[in-house]
């Protein structure tokens, strides 16, 4: 079965405190949904090289055992509560993708 992934790119972070509040709620929701954070750059000391229209501000990659599990985690009550913590006008490019078998 192909794995599922959350891919998030944050073009700019205007309110770091609210993003931290979101993270405190989102982390447990992701874990409860079976997700594993593979990358949280650059905040965990990793490196990012952005090419073309790429933005190096913040990139998050979360792995799930299946695409369906990734969708269910996003739709979960716990994660929806985390989304409410994001600042007004917050911008991110978020998608759920299915990996190759």
Question: Where are each of the predicted segments found?
Answer:
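A short linear hydrophobic-aromatic micro-motif
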Residues: 36-39, 82-83, 92-95
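C-terminal structural segments of small proteins and small subunits
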Residues: 70-91
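C-terminal end-helix/capping segment
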Residues: 87-101
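Short S/T/G/P-rich N-terminal loop/turn motif that feeds into the first structured element of a domain
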Residues: 1-58, 64-71, 75, 98-101
């Amino acid at each position: 079965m192909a794995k599922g992934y959350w891919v998030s790119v944050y073009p700019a972070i205007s309110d770091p405190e609210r993003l931290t509040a979101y993270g405190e709620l989102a982390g447990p929701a992701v874990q409860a949904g079976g997700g594993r954070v593979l990358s949280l750059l650059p905040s965990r000391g990793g490196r990012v090289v952005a090419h073309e229209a790429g933005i190096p501000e913040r990139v998050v990659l979360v792995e799930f055992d299946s695409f369906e599990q990734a969708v269910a985690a996003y739709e979960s009550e716990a994660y929806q509560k985390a989304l409410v913590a994001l600042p007004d006008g917050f911008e991110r490019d978020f998608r759920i993708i299915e990996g190759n078998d």
